[in-house]
């Protein structure tokens, strides 16, 4: 897979012992599930399928950011309790993922489930001198302070240094930090890019008692703690959308390295952004194409999946009605191919053994998850009119996640 930190393709494994760990940043549960979400989780579903096809022992963890400023703001704006909104949206997300046949992680972990563990990690960073307090006059408790991560100290003490993953310059980092939940202008910080580790309680906000005072976790430390708690070190692949490269993945890797003295992951992999009507699909813009609405309109989830697989996971691309129509037509052709399957057809191999087509699909997927290349191979085979063999249909199901012949599958 393409490793963002290296700027090149690297083996998606660490130890060579067949054990692999995948951590993918989950949703903040509001406005779920749009096509951009689905594209990201499908990318790492494909990785998981390739690993499983090779016989690897896969451990996959995904968090749910079930307490965060955007969620709280949406709950306040709509008059809904933030916990109810989170639960409703998580259930919708999981239903959409199941409809798209995206393999579930071994562990879904909500941030609210690990507040104590996060607080303990923050306390450890304070003890090591990698975290420091900042005056917080609007805290509920007089004298309570927010806690921040000292990026300079972390870079001096451990294997991580600011910019290792993203490769961005400081001006780009500052702009992205301000745009993506950071506070580079906050007085009292040692460095404008130092990220929040623990937010002291504010009036009207959820908070928990902890070893570092009453409050709630910062964004990046949540993922670091969950990954370290649930997966072997180092994580084989840390994944997410390319909008998470900085600050989220950069800083979560820094937090993990500061806690362990080791690199967080072997590969940092990122999916491209999806646009709609000329703009990046985003909650803030409201230009969302929701999987649930497509399903409610009668679109076969397999066609949605094929539309996503037709794009390389690292590419930025745009969702259009024409793209969906192409996938609907492709699915119809593939279904007809499956319906004409002849159990005695060998296509150059025994019907119970992988033939050339299956091997070629495996090769394409092994090259940085080249799903467009794999789909082209299937299109060419379907166009020949040669009936599918059972093993070929099983491979399409296992490797691409498309079960042919049944819209309900």
UniProtKB/Swiss-Prot annotation:
Transmembrane segments: none annotated. Its cofactor is Zn(2+). It comes from Clavibacter sepedonicus. Zn(2+) binds at residues 25, 223, 248. Monomer. Keywords: ATP-binding, Ligase, Metal-binding, Nucleotide-binding, Zinc. SUPFAM superfamilies: Nucleotidylyl transferase (SSF52374). A motif ('ERGGDP' region) lies at residues 179-184. Its EC number is 6.3.1.13. Pfam families: tRNA-synt_1e (PF01406). GO terms for cellular component: cytosol. HAMAP family: MshC. Binds 1 zinc ion per subunit. GO terms for molecular function: ATP binding; cysteine-glucosaminylinositol ligase activity; cysteine-tRNA ligase activity; zinc ion binding. A motif ('HIGH' region) lies at residues 27-37. Belongs to the class-I aminoacyl-tRNA synthetase family. MshC subfamily. Catalyzes the ATP-dependent condensation of GlcN-Ins and L-cysteine to form L-Cys-GlcN-Ins. Gene3D superfamilies: Anticodon-binding domain of a subclass of class I aminoacyl-tRNA synthetases, HUPs. It catalyses: 1D-myo-inositol 2-amino-2-deoxy-alpha-D-glucopyranoside + L-cysteine + ATP = 1D-myo-inositol 2-(L-cysteinylamino)-2-deoxy-alpha-D-glucopyranoside + AMP + diphosphate + H(+). One of its GO terms (biological process) is cysteinyl-tRNA aminoacylation. A motif ('KMSKS' region) lies at residues 280-284. It comes from the Bacteria. InterPro entries: Cys-tRNA/MSH_ligase, Mycothiol_ligase_MshC, Rossmann-like_a/b/a_fold, tRNA-synt_1_cat_dom. This is L-cysteine:1D-myo-inositol 2-amino-2-deoxy-alpha-D-glucopyranoside ligase. L-cysteinyl-5'-AMP binds at residues 25-28, 40, 63-65, 219, 241-243, 274. It is an enzyme of class 6 (ligase).
């Amino acid at each position: 897979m393409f490793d963002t930190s290296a700027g090149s393709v690297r083996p998606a494994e660490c130890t060579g012992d067949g054990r692999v760990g995948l951590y993918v940043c989950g949703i903040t549960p509001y406005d779920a599930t749009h096509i951009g979400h689905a594209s990201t989780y499908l990318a790492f579903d494909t990785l998981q399928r390739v690993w499983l096809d090779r016989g690897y022992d896969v451990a996959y963890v995904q968090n749910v950011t079930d307490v965060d400023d955007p969620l709280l703001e949406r709950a306040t704006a709509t008059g809904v309790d933030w916990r109810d909104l989170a639960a409703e949206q998580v259930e919708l997300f999981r239903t959409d993922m199941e409809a798209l046949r995206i393999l579930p992680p071994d562990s879904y972990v909500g941030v609210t489930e690990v507040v104590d563990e996060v607080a303990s990690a923050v306390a450890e960073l304070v003890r090591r001198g990698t975290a420091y307090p900042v005056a917080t006059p609007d805290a509920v408790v007089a004298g309570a302070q927010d806690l921040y991560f000292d990026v300079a100290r972390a870079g001096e003490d451990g294997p991580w240094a600011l910019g290792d993953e993203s490769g961005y310059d400081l001006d780009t980092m500052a702009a992205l930090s301000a745009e993506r939940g950071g506070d580079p202008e906050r007085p009292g910080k040692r460095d404008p890019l130092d990220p929040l580790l623990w937010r002291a309680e504010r009036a009207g906000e959820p908070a928990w008692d902890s070893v570092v005072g009453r409050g709630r976790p910062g964004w990046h430390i949540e993922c670091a703690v969950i990954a370290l708690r649930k997966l072997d070190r180092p994580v084989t692949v840390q994944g997410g959308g390319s909008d998470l490269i900085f600050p989220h993945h950069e800083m979560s890797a820094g937090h993990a390295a500061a806690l362990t003295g080791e690199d967080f992951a072997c590969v940092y992999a990122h999916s491209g952004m999806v646009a709609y009507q000329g703009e990046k699909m985003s909650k803030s813009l409201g230009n969302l194409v929701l999987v649930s609405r497509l399903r409610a309109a009668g679109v076969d989830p397999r066609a949605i999946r094929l539309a996503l697989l037709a794009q390389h996971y690292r590419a930025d691309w745009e969702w259009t009605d024409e793209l969906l129509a192409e996938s609907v037509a492709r699915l119809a052709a593939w279904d007809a191919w499956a319906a004409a399957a002849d159990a005695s057809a060998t296509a150059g191999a025994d019907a119970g053994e992988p033939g050339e087509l299956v091997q070629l699909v495996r090769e394409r997927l092994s090259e940085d998850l080249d799903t467009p290349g794999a789909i082209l191979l299937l299109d060419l085979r379907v166009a020949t009119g040669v009936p599918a063999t059972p093993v070929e249909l099983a491979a399409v199901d296992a490797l691409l996640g498309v079960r042919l012949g049944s819209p309900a599958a």
